[in-house]
Amino acid sequence: MDLQTKLEQLFQQNNDTIKKVKSLDELNQIRVQLLGKKGPITGVLRGMKDLSAEERPKVGAFANKIRDDLSAVIEARKAQLEQAVINAKLASETVDVTLPGDPVEAGTPHIITQIMDDLEGFFMGMGYQVLTGPEVEEDHYNFEMMNIPKDHPARDMQETFYITNELLMRSQTSPMQARTMEKHDFTKGPLKMISPGVVYRRDDDDATHSHQFHQMEGLVIDKHITMADLKGTLLAMCQHVFGKDRTIRLRPSYFPFTEPSVEVDVSCFRCGGKGCPVCKYTGWIEVLGAGMVHPNVLRAANIDADVYGGFAFGLGPDRFAMLKYGIDDIRSFYTDDLRFLTQFSQEG
């Protein structure tokens, strides 16, 4: 029997065997036996040394074809067996897609985060940038550029966590305003920004004070900015947060970085201004401080105070949340009590 006939018989015999294999392990054994170094095809190729020079290329090419054909049959059977394994597994693990799913309990943003996100969205809608800065700040930006030099008595108003003589934990988010004013190109338009974040002061923690709390400060610098612009902005913001029927009033106050300075009260949203314990029977609730940017603050940032002016305001998201939801202890925000926090689950 010549080698070519022997190869044809080898293919026919094993083709049928391969198609009847029932497992991947058995198929792998056949593959090794047929196509391995000790397999019959390799044996045929070794016997080619006894062939003539004319027969050798023909038999070699035919042997390679038989090996490729057997490999193809093995791969086809392998794919069938693998699919059969998958089908069997799917059949044993059938899921009824018509059954209701098990709901996963969803978390929700912290109430302070919700308040801050809402305020940021409001001011972004009015064209403000949202800019954040470092919590470890330079004394220069935290105080001096805010018209509070080292010997200024107003420094006694803020007990500060100092790290070194020139580094501190920021006591307000105003430093980001100073940094931005230094770099802003007013030839490209006005500066409108808010700077939200965490601030630190050496307060004793109690129901209304915390050594760490949140603040959001706003700043607008341009030509021809007036107190009317400030009042309109704050009225819109208070109505957005506390209700469209709210009104505000401005009371004279003092802040080193604004002149004139005002405290902003909103008409009580509990009693409608009639008087109640929330507003201490005055009909008004103090919500934030504001004012027109002091010329010294503009000059410190190399802005011409004779050409440009602006307003600034600072509010506490913690206080806003306490007022809006009737919370009487600021420490509740930081105790991680889920019974308290889940009351403010965000919808959507």
UniProtKB/Swiss-Prot annotation:
InterPro entries: aa-tRNA-synth_II (IPR006195), aa-tRNA-synth_II/BPL/LPL (IPR045864), Phe-tRNA-synth_IIc_asu (IPR004529), Phe-tRNA_ligase_II_N (IPR004188), Phe_tRNA_ligase_alpha1_bac (IPR022911), Phenylalanyl-tRNA_Synthase (IPR002319), tRNA-bd_arm (IPR010978). Its cofactor is Mg(2+). It is an enzyme of class 6 (ligase). GO terms for molecular function: ATP binding; catalytic activity, acting on a protein; magnesium ion binding; phenylalanine-tRNA ligase activity; transferase activity; tRNA binding. The keyword Aminoacyl-tRNA synthetase applies. The keyword Aminoacyl-tRNA synthetase applies. Keywords: Aminoacyl-tRNA synthetase, ATP-binding, Cytoplasm, Ligase, Magnesium, Metal-binding, Nucleotide-binding, Protein biosynthesis. Its main location: cytoplasm. Its EC number is 6.1.1.20. Mg(2+) binds at E259. GO terms for cellular component: cytoplasm. GO terms for biological process: phenylalanyl-tRNA aminoacylation. It is found in: Cytoplasm. It catalyses: tRNA(Phe) + L-phenylalanine + ATP = L-phenylalanyl-tRNA(Phe) + AMP + diphosphate + H(+). Belongs to the class-II aminoacyl-tRNA synthetase family. Phe-tRNA synthetase alpha subunit type 1 subfamily. HAMAP family: Phe_tRNA_synth_alpha1. Tetramer of two alpha and two beta subunits. This is Phenylalanine--tRNA ligase alpha subunit. It comes from Lacticaseibacillus paracasei (strain ATCC 334 / BCRC 17002 / CCUG 31169 / CIP 107868 / KCTC 3260 / NRRL B-441) (Lactobacillus paracasei). The gene is pheS.
